[in-house]
Amino acid sequence: MSHNLKQLFQQHNVKGLSINSKTVKDKDIFFAIKGQNTDGNDFIKDALSKGAVLVITDNKKNIVIDKVIYVKDVQAALYEAIEIFYPKKPKDLIAVTGTNGKSSVVSYIAQTYSLLGKKAASIGTIGVEIFGCVNLINDVPELTTLDYLSFRKIAHNLAENGIEYLVFEASSHGLDQARLREIKVNIACFTSFSQDHLDYHHTKENYLLAKLKLFINHLLPNGIAILNSDIEEIEFVKDYLHNHNIKFITVGTKGDLEITRLNGSLKGQNINFTFNNREYNFNTPIIGSFQASNLLIAVLSIHYIGFAFDDVIDSLVEVKAVKGRMERIDNTNIFVDYAHTPDALEKALTELKNIKLRDSKLSVVFGCGGNRDKAKRSLMGQIAAKRADTIIITDDNPRHEDPKLIRAEIISGIEKADYTEIANREEAIKYGINNLKQDDILLVAGKGHENYQIIGDKKLPFDDAEVVRKCVKVCHPVA
């Protein structure tokens, strides 16, 4: 098969591989793969019309079409083709999993590499970010963990352009569906764990075991797992990894790297910690105790790749907050955060409540996504009622659900607390800003970095941060 594939590549001057007819380019080979929701065999003619030079399929019905080649196992043929066509990867790989914090840790690691003078890239929810050189990648699928072909294509492109270090997010869906296949990493990180994605995993135990596949299936034999010691299930996780002979180290208030004191304000925080019997202290413009853990997980990741610990610590003052992750909008008291789980919302509200002035108020604008875990909606309403002074319930990405019913499920958890319901997200944000008084804080939660809103089949332009900026110009809140 290898010899035949190599011959086909040469004979047809193949330029790339594709499993999505929408993204086929001239002189690609299209692999017609049957997925969970769609079958590539239904799109063979589309792929050919877009310039595919060949189609590989394991469906004999399609071999009557010109340029279609039959194989017994199309997946196996694809994986073999990937090894031939996209063989390269950056030399050191780090993967990050967790309910919340993946994007932050991935960005902090890549930023720190760059500050240490290294070429690095990150892959995840926010897309592909490249540090230390020009942006090389376009047309990235919108998945936290890419399909295997997309991942290998990007990794090969990065390596070809001199990127030495790659850090990426590994979602529970991606791990459960084995999207990473045989990819091995030097370091694997676990940032946090709480309820999410039960629409897919059904139980919290299944969800946790899916996360742990990162360490069991993808960590190199001499690799290290870096764990947040404040995960509620940390003892189970440590026992599980120990039973699989996986080396690990913990970070947090009870960690091997122990966070001993945090002093936070709207402008950032001072972090104190101990490691290897030494005390350390540094300042960061990034707020949130959970972000302190994320920063230090990033520190240990890079240290165990082979960089001097003190050099890594010295670079932290220049690491910036990630778009849509406790992002303070300009010099206002308005924050945009991706918090879309009960745990993330509670942490974000708690952090802001702790740093606000005593007599000021904390407001929150949020909704919940449609066609996603319904069990978390009332919980998020309950958390908002407990932590915020003013609650504004609005729409997130309703997708194909009735947004009014989604809002009702959130409101069912609010119980006796007062709230305002405004379906239109921009109007809800505007209302929240208009009602701010001196020193009040507003959190706009749920969408973070996203620059769209999904309503039915439509993906409409919408960016929480830009809406905030627009409303601030009109409303002139006191910062």
From Swiss-Prot:
Q: Does the keyword RNA-binding apply?
A: no
Q: Where can the motif Meso-diaminopimelate recognition motif be found?
A: 396-399
Quote the InterPro entries the UniProt record gives.
Answer: Mur-like_cat_sf, Mur_ligase_C, Mur_ligase_C_dom_sf, Mur_ligase_cen, Mur_ligase_N, MurE/MurF_N, UDP-N-AcMur-Glu-dNH2Pim_ligase
Keywords, in A-Z order: ATP-binding, Cell cycle, Cell division, Cell shape, Cell wall biogenesis/degradation, Cytoplasm, Ligase, Magnesium, Nucleotide-binding, Peptidoglycan synthesis
GO MF, one term, reads:
UDP-N-acetylmuramoylalanyl-D-glutamate-2,6-diaminopimelate ligase activity
**Functional pathway:** Cell wall biogenesis; peptidoglycan biosynthesis
Q: What does this protein need as cofactor?
A: Mg(2+)
- List the subcellular locations: Cytoplasm
Q: Which residues bind meso-2,6-diaminopimelate?
A: 372, 396-399, 446, 450
**Which residues are noted in the entry as UDP-N-acetyl-alpha-D-muramoyl-L-alanyl-D-glutamate-binding?**
21, 144-145, 171, 177, 179
Reactions catalysed, as given in the entry: UDP-N-acetyl-alpha-D-muramoyl-L-alanyl-D-glutamate + meso-2,6-diaminopimelate + ATP = UDP-N-acetyl-alpha-D-muramoyl-L-alanyl-gamma-D-glutamyl-meso-2,6-diaminopimelate + ADP + phosphate + H(+)
GO BP terms: namely: cell division; cell wall organization; peptidoglycan biosynthetic process; regulation of cell shape
Q: Which residues bind ATP?
A: 98-104
Main location (coarse class): cytoplasm
> Which SUPFAM superfamilies has this protein been placed in?
MurD-like peptide ligases, catalytic domain (SSF53623), MurD-like peptide ligases, peptide-binding domain (SSF53244), MurE/MurF N-terminal domain (SSF63418)
Question: What are the N6-carboxylysine sites (modified residues) in this protein?
Answer: 211
Q: What is this enzyme's EC?
A: 6.3.2.13
Q: Identify one Gene Ontology CC term for this UniProt entry.
A: cytoplasm
Q: Function, please?
A: Catalyzes the addition of meso-diaminopimelic acid to the nucleotide precursor UDP-N-acetylmuramoyl-L-alanyl-D-glutamate (UMAG) in the biosynthesis of bacterial cell-wall peptidoglycan.
**NCBIfam families xrefs:** murE, PRK00139.1-2, PRK00139.1-4
What's this protein's family per the entry?
Answer: Belongs to the MurCDEF family. MurE subfamily.
Q: What is this protein called?
A: UDP-N-acetylmuramoyl-L-alanyl-D-glutamate--2,6-diaminopimelate ligase
Instruction: State the organism of origin.
Output: Rickettsia conorii (strain ATCC VR-613 / Malish 7)
